[in-house]
């Protein structure tokens, strides 16, 4: 879940927020998402970042910025607010480019969220203002602002710009840390410098890179570092004193509430324009500012080598896989935004916290475009596994709460890496454990399953300890005996995957052992976890079922029904009944709920989940991750139309959802029908482990261009609505133009024939990998 300092959520209409459903529009071939209002139905979020710097923006260009130090410290540079005021020096009238916080009526407004950049355009009172923010494709911890004003009228205008950027540069838990802070203007660097250096000289404390700055490409007319001097007494950001007076006071700030405010005056003849560039960033010391300003404060909106390099880098993120289907919304997600969202997950995960299962699953999706970066993170995950096989819950910072599922996620992620690259030598890499000793990657994977095999309860199911995938099942295993059905199913899937890996590298005895483990666990699940119409969620310390018809609330859970298929556990008749139960009890109309009915009162043997507000988070929300698992289960079973219906229901742009959410990125979930006041509103854009699963479901199972340990195979599962589709895929250095014909418009039709460059090809064989380029024609059965 989000921490308390992330982007501001829009206020629901019943509490005074906007009730207008402002539509979104794709531009620039799907690479920009545009909205023509600063007040959408639900706040839009865009993440722009590089490995060391993250800026989180809403549709007004507001949002915080963070710096990841070389030591892994996640330090906040900018607070939530970032405003640019535009003032007419003659009339005293002013507006804010991002609409907030002045909220003055505009003539035209547009926000365009791009890949690692964002542009806001605002035409108010005859002034066209353009404000672009981007983070360069480098490791420099900076963001660049380009601001241009154009006089659209027939009279000369004397205009003023005022920036407003609160910059506490906090992030370390120091006793009275603010007492060491100073913010002042450095004329040589043309920068406001927020300095937190003093603690590094204290005994045992060293905090390099904990300083921030706001720099400009010219000498400002004035500046302020004191928030109090900018706002003034008994005022707010809606009517700041410095802006109303049209003059900064050149104030320093000692200790409390530093702000980056600079004043720029522009004289604009009719039709004329002027442009200024700012840069915000983190630095180790003042001299570093000068090197960064020399590097970055020379470009403009029209000509900027760093912005050009950014566009080139973003294009490379999706070059190995492009799809074309009759569904343009799906195409935009798969071709542009899902690769970007996966990349964000690999680099920043959850705002800098490296959740173990989160980053591993992101790597599972990243191997197509960034196999080396994915492997680097997977090896880090190995290094955060204990010798016993238990994996940490996360790092940055270290979280060792005993969530039992962490390390088993490595099995499927490494499988995807091996299938994509064919780099089986990686299994022999030696990686240290987090506590003691070291082992090969293969042994790390084996230990993850051995840990689960040993941690079993009275029903031979896996012990849940503090929680499994569902973080909030904290009451199931208070006394150390509670068992998780989902984790037992995940163990089954991991056993089968590792068996395939072991067999591929000649470890046939291991493969047989893993398959035996799967069979034993599947038998235990079918014996103890079937409730008559669905699989239960868990058994508590005393063997009482959770997620059962006999429970008052939380009778049925989603994940156990999907993972019964993914772990190859469910018999045919039980699958049919289980799926019917899902449709009967969990369908919201715009995605499947995680459980039902929602908990409305605390249940001791369930724990935190039962105290979460109904419809939120894990308590009966439409959780995207859970829907992704079911989507894969449906595709594995060949249920193409049902899968496509589920995709359309849960995808973020579904117009049937009560709240119109941004359509370009997946949310963690949506408040469910039982929510008191936010039904259908997206929870936490960008930060979800569902993206690689959704991406893989569409590209490898629906379109069927699937990597395996033996190579690339074609096994589509197209919905009946699609007569054709195509995939451009680069795999192990070979390029394939794959064209799929479903002339009979048959759901889930099997492959009838394949030709490669016009010659017939065996439909059961992997495609040839020879470093060349090939046209692959796939005809499905009519």
Question: What are the functions of these language-model segments?
Answer:
Residues 85-87, 366-462, 484-492, 621-643, ...:
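Aromatic-rich carbohydrate-recognition surfaces in CAZymes
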Residues 1-357, 372-380, 384, 416-421, ...:
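Anionic coordination/interaction segments
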Residues 123, 139-141, 270, 329, ...:
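Secondary-structure capping and boundary motifs in well-ordered enzyme cores
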Residues 138-164, 211-213, 217-227, 269, ...:
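Beta-rich accessory regions
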Residues 361, 390-409, 434-436, 459-483, ...:
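Carbohydrate-binding/catalytic loop surfaces
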């Amino acid at each position: 879940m989000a921490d308390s300092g992330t982007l501001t959520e829009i206020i629901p209409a019943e509490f005074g927020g906007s009730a207008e459903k402002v539509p979104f529009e794709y531009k620039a071939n799907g690479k920009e998402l545009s909205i023509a209002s600063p007040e959408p139905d639900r706040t839009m979020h865009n993440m722009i970042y590089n490995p060391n710097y993250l800026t989180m923006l809403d549709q007004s260009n507001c949002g915080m910025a963070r710096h990841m130090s070389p030591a892994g410290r996640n330090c906040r540079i900018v607070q939530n607010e970032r405003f640019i005021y535009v003032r007419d020096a003659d009339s005293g009238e002013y507006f804010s480019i991002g609409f907030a916080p002045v909220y003055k009526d505009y003539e035209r407004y547009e926000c365009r969220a791009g890949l690692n950049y964002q542009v806001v355009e605002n035409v108010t009172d005859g002034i066209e203002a353009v404000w672009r923010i981007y983070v360069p494709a480098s490791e420099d911890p900076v963001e660049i602002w380009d601001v241009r004003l154009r006089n659209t009228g027939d009279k000369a205008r004397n205009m003023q710009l005022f920036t407003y950027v609160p910059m506490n540069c906090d992030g370390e838990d120091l006793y009275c840390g603010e007492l060491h802070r100073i913010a002042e203007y450095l004329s040589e660097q043309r920068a406001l410098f927020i300095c937190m250096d003093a603690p590094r000289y204290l005994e045992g404390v060293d905090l390099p890179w904990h300083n921030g700055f706001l720099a400009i490409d010219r000498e400002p007319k004035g500046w302020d570092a004191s928030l109090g001097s900018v706002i003034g007494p008994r005022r707010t950001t809606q009517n700041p004193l410095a802006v109303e007076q049209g003059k900064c006071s050149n104030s320093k700030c000692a200790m409390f509430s530093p702000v980056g405010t600079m004043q720029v005056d522009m004289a604009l003849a009719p039709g004329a324009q002027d442009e200024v560039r700012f840069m915000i960033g983190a630095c180790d010391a003042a001299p570093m500012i000068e090197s960064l300003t020399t590097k970055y404060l020379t470009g403009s909106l029209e000509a900027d080598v760093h912005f050009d390099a950014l566009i080139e880098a973003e294009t490379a993120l999706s070059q190995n896989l492009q799809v074309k289907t009759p569904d343009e919304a799906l195409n935009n997600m798969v071709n542009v935004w899902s690769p970007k969202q996966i990349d964000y997950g690999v680099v920043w995960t959850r705002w800098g916290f490296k959740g173990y299962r989160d980053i591993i699953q992101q790597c599972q999706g990243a191997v197509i475009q960034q196999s080396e970066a994915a492997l680097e993170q997977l090896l880090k995950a190995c290094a955060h596994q204990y010798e016993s096989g238990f994996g940490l819950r996360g790092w940055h910072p270290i979280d060792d709460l005993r969530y039992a599922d962490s390390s088993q996620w490595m099995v499927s992620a490494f499988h995807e890496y091996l299938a994509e690259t064919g780099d089986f030598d990686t299994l022999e890499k030696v990686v240290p454990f987090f506590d003691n000793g070291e082992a090969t990657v293969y042994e790390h994977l084996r230990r993850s399953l051995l840990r689960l095999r040993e941690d079993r309860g009275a029903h031979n199911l896996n012990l849940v300890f503090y929680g499994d995938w569902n973080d909030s099942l904290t009451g199931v295993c208070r006394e150390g005996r509670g068992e998780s059905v989902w984790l037992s199913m995940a163990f089954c899937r991991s056993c089968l995957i590792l068996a395939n890996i072991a067999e591929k590298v000649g470890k046939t005895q291991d493969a047989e052992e893993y398959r035996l483990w799967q069979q034993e666990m599947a038998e235990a699940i079918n014996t103890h976890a079937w409730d008559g119409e669905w699989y239960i969620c868990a058994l508590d310390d005393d063997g009482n079922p959770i997620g059962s018809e006999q429970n008052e609330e939380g009778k049925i859970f989603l994940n156990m029904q999907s993972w019964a298929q993914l772990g190859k556990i469910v018999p045919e008749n039980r699958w049919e009944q289980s799926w019917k139960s899902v449709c009967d009890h969990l369908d919201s109309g715009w995605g499947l709920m995680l459980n039902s009915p929602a908990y409305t009162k605390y249940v001791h043997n369930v724990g935190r989940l039962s105290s979460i507000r109904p419809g939120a988070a894990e308590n009966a929300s439409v959780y995207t991750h859970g829907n992704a698992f079911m989507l894969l289960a449906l595709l594995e079973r060949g249920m193409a139309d049902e899968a496509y219906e589920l995709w359309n229901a849960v995808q973020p742009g579904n117009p049937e959802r009560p709240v119109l959410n941004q359509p370009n990125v997946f949310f963690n979930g949506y408040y469910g029908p039982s929510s008191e006041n936010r039904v259908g509103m997206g929870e936490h854009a960008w930060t979800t482990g569902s993206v690689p699963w959704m991406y893989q479901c569409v590209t490898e199972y629906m379109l069927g261009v699937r990597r395996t340990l033996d190579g690339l195979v074609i096994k589509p599962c197209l919905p009946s609505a699609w007569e054709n589709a195509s995939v451009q895929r680069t795999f192990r250095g070979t390029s394939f133009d794959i064209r799929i014909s479903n002339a009979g418009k048959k759901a889930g039709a099997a492959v009838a024939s394949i030709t490669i460059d016009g010659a017939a090809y065996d439909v059961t064989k992997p495609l040839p990998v020879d470093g060349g380029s090939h046209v692959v024609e796939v005809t499905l059965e009519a």
